[in-house]
Amino acid sequence: MTNIQYIKSQTQLPEKAIENTLSLLTEGCTIPFIARYRKDSTQNLDEVAIEHIAKSQADYDNICKRKETILSSIEEQGKLTDELRKRIENSFELNELEDLYLPYKKRRKTKADVAKENGLEPLAKQIMSQRVTDLELLAGRYLSDKVPTEKEALQGASDIIAEWINENTFIRRTLRRIFQRKAIISSEVAKGKNEEEEAQKYAQYFDWEEALNKAPSHRVLAMLRAEKEGFVKLKVQVDSEETLPFMEENIIKSRGEVADFLKKTVKDSYKRLLEPSISNETLQEAKDKADAKAISVFAENLSQLLLASPLGEKRILAIDPGYRTGCKVVCLDEKGDLLHHDVIYPHAPQNDMTMATKKLSSTVSQYNIQAISIGNGTASRETESFVRSIAFPKKVEVFVVSEAGASVYSASKIARDEFPDYDVTVRGAVSIGRRLADPLAELVKIDPKSIGVGQYQHDVNQSLLKEELDATVVRCVNKVGVNLNTASKSLLSYVSGIGEKMAENIVAYRSANGAFSKREDLKKVPRLGDKVYQQAVAFLRVHNSENPLDNSALHPEAYPIIKQMAKDTGISVAQLIGNKQAIATIDIQKYKTDKVGELYLKDVLKELEKPGLDPRTTAKAFAFDPNVKTFDDVRIGMILPGIVNNITAFGCFVDIGVKESGLVHISQLKDAYVSDVNEVVKLHQQVQVKVIEVDQIRKRISLTMII
């Protein structure tokens, strides 16, 4: 099987699209670049499909490397037959490869190995021929100092046969399929743990069982976590009536004494060798699927968070609320630069509301503040109420933003580099303000795992999680585009083709030489070659460039075509931009070439209509119910405004203005059946919910969605 055939079997994509995509990837093209500017080559594949191709190619390479290792190992042992080589070379399933390698794998000495050393393999072969009538008589021929009795000889032969059965690729493959279809996962409380307070969060798994292939991902991960923490014991089993008859049918071809002997051996092989092995495999496979689902949920949440509505270039006063240590206040200009910082003490124990009001009022006037951003942590509701009570001399919108990860950012190297002369409290408040202005630009500075929108994020495969989250950030950054003259090093590093080192070079060049006046100036950055320029330039915007196309998602390679389009239309390029009437008259067939296809040209016209359009909507102000500030204020039947602050596979959590977010279970999202929570709600969506349950002991709030 070629790599193209393998990838096609994994992705169900056309061979030509796969070939062209791999060719572009080999040339050093990035996934965002290929998805946006090489649609005609890939047959309009999106980033997810291209990532799938790249991953499948990596899987193919890993399988081929594993084959080489297996073949080399068996050959060194002098046991590689032509038939075995052919079976290994024709296999492209890792499980099957490992099954084929199992008899030749280096391992600890087994019962079967000892029996073979004692000369009992010929006895085992004779029994397996099933042409024997008297087992004890036959076993008597193999007695020795190490095997003094017929019983021990037969036991040794049984151990050898049990291992042969365990190494039978057909039996292993069939059992694997039976387990995949019919395995039951069960859990029971670990000895002495049922009374422990910490264990109570897993109480539902103290005596639990269900079909493994029906268990939702979050439940699989919850059970695995409970086992890891020592509170429960897990088992994955199939009724032996589903497995032993199949094995006996394939092994036993005789009757009488030999059949009875082999029946016991089959059972021993299954219980001692096969069941534990296949059970572990099946559970690992279930975990892998659960990991993939959890990672997918996390990535979708992160994407929604990164693409959250920005307020835009406004003057913002940001407040990081607090009680005893006060509320940290900073003022930011339109570019997010720090203008002023202070501390106010409107809450207990100081309760200095008069001075706090005076300071905020004068600061809003002095710095021409247009919006106030309040962190949603400790003392958030009280601070919001206090701010809204102030009669500012001009209209100022008030927003509450998530401060998850702000403390992580404030202590990070990035924050220290940005604000070397300020402490963590000022840096944290700046982050809260910048999140309102442009969530994407600020959140890329923080490890996504610190943002708090993941489901079982510490339980899943960490390398796969990082890979998917990094890919998500790259997708979001390149979807929006980046201002070349204001973007931070962190933001630039995610732009197609750039990376951390080149981002440093760009920022250093910008600091030394001033703002870029046009995209082409990017070529002056040290070590930024033609390939990086090709991959990156269209994702970078230069406002007020002498060429208006530099502030769009149009690639410079399209500029000559656009210039010709404008000329053929009888107007300038500047007049063509945004001119729907003129653009509608353009016949793209006139501009098609071997290298420029119809999909590319359609995208050019679409971008010309609305150049540089930000796919994000503008931020809207929101207010919680002023009468609900603590958990004790929440009552069953209340209808409350809220903001979706986390999405999981089993529902969504809604911030209703108290410390504890309420859960809207997937069954409470709407009247109809819901298979995917993301089809109904989005992260940070403003909603109305009704309280249906308040658990005072566990401090849990259950909600149902109204809108």
Regions found by a protein language model. Give the residues of each.
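Single-stranded RNA-binding regions, centering on S1/OB-family and related RNA-binding modules
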Residues: 542-707
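A glycine-rich phosphate-binding loop feature that marks nucleotide/adenosyl-phosphate handling sites
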Residues: 177-184, 319-323, 377-382, 401-408, ...
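Generic start-of-chain signal for non-secretory N-termini
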Residues: 1-19, 26
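Long, highly charged, low-complexity intrinsically disordered interaction regions
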Residues: 61-79, 89, 417-515, 534-561, ...
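Structured, non-catalytic alpha/beta "coupling" segments that mediate domain-domain communication
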Residues: 73, 87, 100, 226-239, ...
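Duplex nucleic acid-engaging cores and interfaces of nucleic-acid transaction enzymes
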Residues: 49-52, 59, 63-318, 324-422, ...
